[in-house]
Curated annotation (Swiss-Prot):
Residues 359-594 form the NR LBD domain. This is Nuclear receptor subfamily 4 group A member 1. It is found in: Nucleus; Cytoplasm, Cytosol; Mitochondrion. The keyword Membrane does not apply. Residues 263-338 bind DNA. The gene is Nr4a1.
């Protein structure tokens, strides 16, 4: 079949069809372009000689553009080799060359897309001169064209140089036959020399290999090839470049040994991170920020919408969002040590002071000592005012009897206050709670302590000051209340309560829940300790087969004590109405504060 062979070599002064092509490779139209050989623009493009095909393979062509072989289909009239002097006239008269289309050529080269034509499309062994260039359709030959020597990355496409991503290769495969199954990832192309003189596309060795799925180029990175191929300079057509094209693409950062993805990056701000801190790979800055925040229990406030960006450049702008991101990526607050000294210098923290009477034995001993110290000496009782034979007087009480009643109450209050201060744990309460407990339990403690010291069988009442009075001596001032106190004293003595049990019972009357306490939890803890101490003592009493029943009977006296307290308030109220003697301020205050409860 006769053919016409053409090669690049158009003189610089002769304009060619390439000048009419647009600079945008995306704007090139490959849909059946038509060429007229009779045109004056294409007439002088025929070279003087028609070299053989080996010229392309052995001539050492180093131009920038690829080499293509054009083969015209045979017609009824054979096509002879054209010369430079007769190409104009023969093209105008020959029926074979009168008009033909670009698709009638057999093209050996690299071009994107698929040219629709009756002939098979082929691929030549001379692919792109540099890796990753978007191959475009070749221009018609221009005689004596001298390509400029450019770097392998600065092609003639100018602003349309190949991008450094894999997206530019996507359009190369859009017109390939669709394969069944899920779409493959972006691929690289590798062209090998054809095995036959005119292989088809189905027979051409088109190698596809997927790009690394996890590798992404960072900012400022560039493509590079393995060390076996140090450069990608333009090579001659007869040089096999399939090895270079088949080599996987690696980045500069990948060659240095760092893996792709987020490994080696701070999970909070994206800065360099060498190891894990508090369960997450973070940088030193975010590690220190998280540690300081947890140790100081710092509270931050976001001035925006709590969605501030946290990166290497803006991580110090919003501390709230930075700490929230630390928690979101998985940093654990419990891992942070909070017992470290500031600067790891200074004195060790002092040990918390333990109360000296923490054990039940020590607590019981302290309660007994407090009770004995607050009571009168039985060997030195004051009988100076005691009168056993007193004639009963009928009628209203006089001012002397009322004043005696008020004096006995006021004197007991000072003694009870000193006794309470010796109870372990009482002085550790707030002053407000101490006053509230004393004023609320004063009348109950007055009755309990008086009933325990007195001798109801003899009618003797022994007060805290050591003063001994007969029941009849107190009848006008105390009224019927004194008889109820003596009855309570008989029942209390019938239980055989010893001093340790009575000391614990008195403390329980004082240390109890009251309305208006500032720290009721501490009062409850102290009450539980005293109750445990009383329970252990009752269980250790020898000769008692049922300590639980004895304890319940003892604690059953507390409701009776509350009833007697109410009767005492009623007596004070009656004396206030008679207004014979004004009550002391402390008694009046206790009455007014306790009456509402």
């Amino acid at each position: 079949m006769p053919c016409i062979q053409a090669q690049y070599g158009t003189p610089a002064t002769s304009p060619g069809p390439r000048d009419h092509l647009t600079g945008d490779p995306l704007a090139l139209e490959f849909s059946k372009p038509t060429m007229d050989l009779a045109s004056p623009e294409t007439a002088p493009t025929a070279p003087a000689t028609l070299p053989s095909f080996s010229t392309f393979m052995d001539g050492g062509y180093t131009g920038e553009f690829d080499t293509f072989l054009y083969q015209l289909p045979g017609t009824a009239q054979p096509c002879s080799s054209a010369s430079s002097t007769s190409s104009s006239s023969s093209s105008a008269t020959s029926p074979a060359s009168a008009s033909f289309k670009f698709e009638d050529f057999q093209v050996y080269g690299c071009y994107p897309g698929t040219l629709s034509g009756p002939l098979d499309e082929t691929l030549s062994s001379s692919g792109s001169d540099y890796y990753g260039s978007p191959c475009s359709a070749p221009s018609p030959p221009t005689p004596n064209f001298q390509p400029s020597q450019l770097s392998p990355w600065d092609g003639s496409f100018g602003h349309f140089s190949p991008s450094q991503t894999y997206e530019g290769l996507r359009v190369w495969t859009e017109q390939l036959p669709k394969a069944s199954g899920p779409p493959p990832p972006p691929t690289f192309f590798s062209f090998s020399p054809p095995t036959g003189p005119s292989p088809s596309l189905a027979q051409s060795s088109l190698k596809l290999f997927p790009a690394p799925a996890t590798h992404q180029l960072g900012e400022g990175e560039s493509y590079s090839v393995p060390a076996a191929f140090p450069g990608l300079a333009p090579t001659s057509p007869n040089c096999d470049t399939s090895g270079i094209l088949d080599a996987p693409v690696t980045s500069t950062k990948a060659r240095s040994g760092s893996s792709g993805g987020s490994e080696g990056r701070c999970a909070v701000c994206g800065d360099n991170a060498s190891c894990q801190h508090y369960g997450v790979r973070t940088c030193e800055g975010c590690k220190g920020f998280f540690k300081r925040t947890v140790q100081k229990s710092a509270k931050y406030i976001c001035l925006a919408n709590k969605d501030c960006p946290v990166d290497k450049r803006r991580r110090n702008r919003c501390q709230f969002c930075r700490f929230q991101k630390c928690l979101a990526v998985g940093m654990v607050k419990e891992v942070v040590r909070t017992d470290s000294l500031k600067g790891r210098r200074g004195r060790l923290p002092s040990k918390p002071k333990q109360p000296p009477d923490a054990s039940p034995t020590n607590l019981l001993t302290s309660l007994i000592r407090a009770h004995l110290d607050s009571g009168p000496n039985t060997a030195k009782l004051d009988y100076s005012k005691f009168q056993e034979l007193v004639l009963p007087r009928f009628g209203k009480e006089d001012a002397g009897d009322v004043q005696q009643f008020y004096d006995l109450l006021s004197g007991s209050l000072d003694v009870i206050r000193k006794w309470a201060e010796k109870i372990p744990g009482f002085i550790e309460l707030s002053p407000g709670d101490q006053d509230l407990l004393l004023e609320s339990a004063f009348l109950e403690l007055f009755i309990l302590r008086l009933a325990y010291r007195s001798k109801p069988g003899e009618g003797k009442l022994i007060f805290c000051s050591g003063l001994v009075l007969h029941r009849l001596q107190c009848a006008r001032g105390f009224g019927d209340w004194i008889d109820n106190i003596l009855a309570f004293s008989r029942s209390l003595h019938s239980l055989g309560v010893d001093v340790p049990a009575f000391a614990c019972l008195s403390a329980l009357v004082l240390i109890t829940d009251r309305h208006g306490l500032q720290d009721p939890r501490r009062v409850e803890e102290l009450q539980n300790r005293i109750a445990s101490c009383l329970k252990e003592h009752m269980a250790a009493v020898a000769g008692d087969p049922q300590p639980a029943s004895c304890l319940s009977r003892l604690l059953g006296k507390l409701p009776e004590l509350r009833t007697l307290c109410t009767q005492g308030l009623q007596r004070i109220f009656c004396l206030k109405l008679e207004d014979l003697v004004p009550p002391p301020p402390i008694v009046d205050k206790i009455f007014m504060d306790t009456l509402s409860f």
